Amino acid sequence: MNLQQKLAQFPRLDLVGSATPLEKLSRLSDYLGREIYIKRDDVTPMAMGGNKLRKLEFLAADALRQGADTLVTAGAIQSNHVRQTAAVAAKLGLHCVALLENPIDTQEENYLTNGNRLLLGLFNAQVEMCEALHDPQQQLADLATRLEAQGFRPYVVPVGGSNALGALGYVQCALEIAEQSQRSNVAFSSVVVASGSAGTHAGLAVGLQQLLPETELVGVTVSRKVIDQLPKVEQIQKALANSLAIDELAPITLWDDYFAPQYGMPNEEGLAAIQLLAQQEGVLLDPVYSGKAMAGLIDGVAQQRFRDDGPILFIHTGGAPALFAYHPQV
């Protein structure tokens, strides 16, 4: 059974539609002196796009299979994942309850009310604030218990949609990359992705190891040092591989030099990457995920950190709505 057939065994909603574009960034390539391509998961078709929709194809299908009437999830006030979960709930006629934290402890009006937070209101999500997501798995379980007592049938979507089931979405993305690579006759030496809640990274690690085993996958951390992030990626990678009856696991590569000072707080390199991509390519990155990941790619080229000097593929996970929340910093 090939990878596509294994994937087809899992219930899945068709939310993404056709494969997202894979394009060469010609002006950025000239600027960096290296062939750079981009996988446009920022233009998935719902709620201003983003990578979480791939995970929600599997997670929401599971919720419907279980007879849920409510999607429950958690994240930062400016969470792209929560925004996309709320949109999917609206599309499916489900209630959405979101547990939110303010990880950067700001009182900036745009952060508190604009960007992704504004969109949650449009999708009619029920928002509950908490002081901190110190144990999100337990906090979501407690919230689900309360909702059950009120007569709801909740389905807990993990933070970032990141578990073995959600990560199947990025095995599907790996299938698209392999097909598009073959069709365009480009052999990627490296793939770069933001590594946060770890499901996207783990899904690509499993998928690319099966399909493009010679391609290096680099996860640029957005919230943790390698010592803390590595077990998260490996845990999902292992569970995902088990669910697909895959024995061989690729080693995980992480770069943690680009997320300081902390998750959700912009830095100079990330903001410079946002400006560069906007001005060179008309592509919008964000200050939390893709801007910092692109800063890693740019510095990785400059410092010759990649395994070899072939074409690099950047996975654009989305997040542009957060630009409005971080004004005037951006």
UniProtKB/Swiss-Prot annotation:
Keywords: Lyase, Pyridoxal phosphate. Pfam families: PALP. It catalyses: D-cysteine + H2O = hydrogen sulfide + pyruvate + NH4(+) + H(+). One of its GO terms (molecular function) is D-cysteine desulfhydrase activity. GO terms for biological process: D-amino acid metabolic process. Its EC number is 4.4.1.15. It comes from the Bacteria. The modification N6-(pyridoxal phosphate)lysine is found at residue 52. It is an enzyme of class 4 (lyase). InterPro entries: ACCD_DCysDesulf (IPR027278), D-Cys_desShydrase (IPR005966), D_Cys_desulphydr_bac (IPR023702), TrpB-like_PALP (IPR001926), TrpB-like_PALP_sf (IPR036052). The keyword Ribosomal protein does not apply. Its cofactor is pyridoxal 5'-phosphate. Homodimer. Catalyzes the alpha,beta-elimination reaction of D-cysteine and of several D-cysteine derivatives. It could be a defense mechanism against D-cysteine. PANTHER family: 1-AMINOCYCLOPROPANE-1-CARBOXYLATE DEAMINASE-RELATED. Belongs to the ACC deaminase/D-cysteine desulfhydrase family. This is D-cysteine desulfhydrase. It comes from Serratia proteamaculans (strain 568). The lineage of its organism: Bacteria, Pseudomonadati, Pseudomonadota, Gammaproteobacteria, Enterobacterales. The gene is dcyD.
